[in-house]
């Protein structure tokens, strides 16, 4: 497994997910199932790897949809969250601690019909290394489903500073949370007016804290992501871009579904 540094600045993702667990109900699970089905279609009988399982909600949704699920996360508390979700629903699938930066670990996992890593790779601190490694457990002909923060240029640099300050201690957390409350308040009002649910069964507040604190933090232009994975032997089959185009500058995650070619070229070094 990739080594942990005691001095590294890293958001406590698992701690945030533990707050979310108490709000996981049938409505949220159904929303997560719908999100997976919309993007991936029928996954019944497929092998499914949740790389960076977080709260475990996506793993649970995939399991209920009939997939054979395995899951891992770098964060110990996130692994605990997923196992608690299993216990609460009386279900079981392979869940363990692991790192997408550990190529040997990913090789030992074997290969899967579907590998999902939603909102994970840009938080590793080595995003392009994570891109290379996440290709390992995808079967030839299999699907890779990822989401990556959109590159907003200067605004992305601003958010990186915000996240770095947030993770300096309690004062940074309180200060950054308070001065950005209008950001989440505006989103809350819009959703109340439009009655639009939170995507993927998530919580607006948990997403807000994850956005403010999520560090390490990297971004990429959609075209760069597509071209990089093409070099790894993948063909893009579906995108959902926050800017609506390959050059959009809105904030949020760009979603990509890639298919691994049977005759893929040599991997990037």
Regions found by a protein language model. Give the residues of each.
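A short glycine-rich, Lys/Arg-flanked "PGG" loop and its adjoining helix->strand segment in the class I
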Residues: 128-140
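Conserved alpha-helix/loop element of class I SAM-dependent methyltransferases that forms part
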Residues: 26-45
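Short alpha-helix
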Residues: 216-232
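Class I SAM-dependent methyltransferase SAM/SAH-binding core
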Residues: 57-102
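Conserved class I S-adenosyl-L-methionine
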Residues: 46-52, 143-184
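A short acidic, Gly/Pro-enriched loop at the edge of an enzyme's catalytic core
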Residues: 104-114
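A short SAM/SAH-binding and catalytic strip from SAM-dependent methyltransferases
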Residues: 114-126
């Amino acid at each position: 497994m990739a080594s942990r540094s005691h001095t590294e600045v890293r958001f406590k993702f698992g701690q945030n997910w533990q707050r979310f667990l108490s709000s996981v109900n049938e409505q949220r699970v159904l929303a997560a199932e719908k999100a997976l089905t919309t993007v991936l279609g029928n996954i019944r009988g497929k092998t499914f790897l949740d790389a960076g399982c977080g709260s475990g909600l996506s793993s649970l949704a995939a399991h209920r949809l009939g997939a054979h699920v395995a899951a891992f996360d770098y964060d110990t508390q996130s692994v605990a969250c997923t196992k608690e979700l299993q216990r609460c629903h009386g279900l079981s699938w392979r869940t363990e601690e692991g790192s997408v930066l550990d190529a040997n670990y990913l090789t030992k996992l074997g290969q899967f019909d579907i590998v999902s890593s939603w909102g994970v790779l840009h938080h590793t601190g080595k995003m392009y290394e994570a891109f290379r490694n996440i290709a390992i457990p995808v079967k030839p002909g299999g699907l890779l489903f990822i989401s990556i923060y959109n590159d907003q240029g200067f605004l992305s640099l601003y958010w990186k500073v915000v996240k770095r300050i947030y993770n300096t201690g309690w004062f940074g957390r309180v200060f950054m949370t308070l001065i950005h409350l209008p950001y989440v308040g505006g989103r809350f009002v819009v959703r109340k007016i439009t009655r639009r649910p939170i995507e993927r069964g998530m919580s607006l507040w948990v997403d807000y804290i994850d956005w403010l604190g999520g560090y390490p933090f990297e971004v990429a232009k959609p075209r760069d992501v597509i071209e990089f994975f093409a070099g790894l032997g993948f063909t893009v089959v579906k995108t959902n871009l926050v800017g609506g185009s390959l050059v959009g500058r809105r904030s949020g995650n760009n979603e990509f579904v890639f298919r691994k070619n049977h005759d893929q070229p040599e991997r990037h070094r």
